[in-house]
């Protein structure tokens, strides 16, 4: 069963590496906030009402983060880059499948 807590545990390492993403609890679930480097203003905030929504959002954030790391943000991503990032995401998808049993 997915819970907010185990989703956050699974993505703990990623969230520790990405200085622009933060997840905070709120009355309606959890909010993922994106910061713009050193700005005091956030870029966006997304309310996740269910653990599934939080998982999906963090997986997409992780995918984007790893793709930017591969390209260093200096070139267009290739199909090989995208495939490599898909492979990095697979353990998260496998974990989700097991957690939903």
Pin down the residues of each PLM region.
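Short intrinsically disordered terminal tails
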Residues: 1-2, 94-101
């Amino acid at each position: 069963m997915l819970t907010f807590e185990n989703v956050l545990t699974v993505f703990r390492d990623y969230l520790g590496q990405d200085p622009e993403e933060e997840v905070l609890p709120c009355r309606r679930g959890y909010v993922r906030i994106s910061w713009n480097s050193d700005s005091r203003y956030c870029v966006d905030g997304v309310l996740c009402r269910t653990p599934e929504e939080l998982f999906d959002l963090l997986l997409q954030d992780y995918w984007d983060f790893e793709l930017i790391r591969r390209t260093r943000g200096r070139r267009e991503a290739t199909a090989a880059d995208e495939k490599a990032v898909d492979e990095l995401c697979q353990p998260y998808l496998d974990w989700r499948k097991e957690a939903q049993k």
